[in-house]
Amino acid sequence: MKTTRRDATRSRHQRVRRKVVGTAERPRLAVFRSNQHIYAQVIDDAQQHTLAAASTVESDLKSSSGATCDASTAVGKLVAERAIEKGIKAVVFDRGGNLYHGRVKALADAAREAGLEF
């Protein structure tokens, strides 16, 4: 049976997750990318708790096109602002099995510019 793109992304994500673990001091910035939207969460894996989140599904970001680099930039800025409000300055980046390119890279760059360190 042929391996689909989704299956390849899942196996890459499992490989990445073996190496990337978020703690209370340095939580994990997890990115999920679908065809129409992009989601970002700051997660403390020890407590299994989401500390901050943002996505293009939210009403304040819904006006921007969900599947573009501009929308990803807006999500990156918003999740970084929400994390900094909660006192989080450093994170570990989890690209979620996606290549570090395009929308995922735009989100990461925007989060760095907004003040998150990774």
UniProtKB/Swiss-Prot annotation:
Record's keyword annotation contains RNA-binding: yes
Swiss-Prot/TrEMBL GO biological process terms: translation
Bias (Basic residues) ranges: 11-20
GO CC, one annotated term: cytosolic large ribosomal subunit
Composition bias type Basic and acidic residues, residue spans: 1-10
GO molecular function list: 5S rRNA binding; structural constituent of ribosome
Stretches assigned to coiled coil: none
Keywords: Ribonucleoprotein, Ribosomal protein, RNA-binding, rRNA-binding
Region named Disordered: 1-20
One Pfam family matching this protein: Ribosomal_L18p
Key word DNA-binding present: no
Family listed: Belongs to the universal ribosomal protein uL18 family.
Function: This is one of the proteins that bind and probably mediate the attachment of the 5S RNA into the large ribosomal subunit, where it forms part of the central protuberance.
Complex formation: Part of the 50S ribosomal subunit; part of the 5S rRNA/L5/L18/L25 subcomplex. Contacts the 5S and 23S rRNAs.
PANTHER family: 39S RIBOSOMAL PROTEIN L18, MITOCHONDRIAL, LARGE RIBOSOMAL SUBUNIT PROTEIN UL18M
Protein known as: Large ribosomal subunit protein uL18
